[in-house]
Amino acid sequence: MKTKITELFGIEHPIIQGGMHHVGFAELAAAVSNGGGLGTITGLTQGTPEKLANEIDKCKSMTDKPFAVNLTFLPSLTPPDYPGLVDVIVVKDV
């Protein structure tokens, strides 16, 4: 099936996994991507830029298909390292 979504993301099916806190790890993202959709790693679930970088590398080792990283910006008294997380996503070319 070809749609604007499949063409834009280079996927087989117009299915995009949403970011899901506490379960958005490489295993789920790779399974969705390998099934023809666009899998998604949930950035804040990883906790730190280093852990996110490791999770992206893990996903890349599990699939050669496109996948995404969801990064939700939430108000917080002690926010996570958003600049570091964004840098990892850019450097890892996701």
What are these model-predicted stretches?
Residues M1-V94:
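Active-site entrance/lid segments in N-terminal catalytic domains of soluble metabolic enzymes
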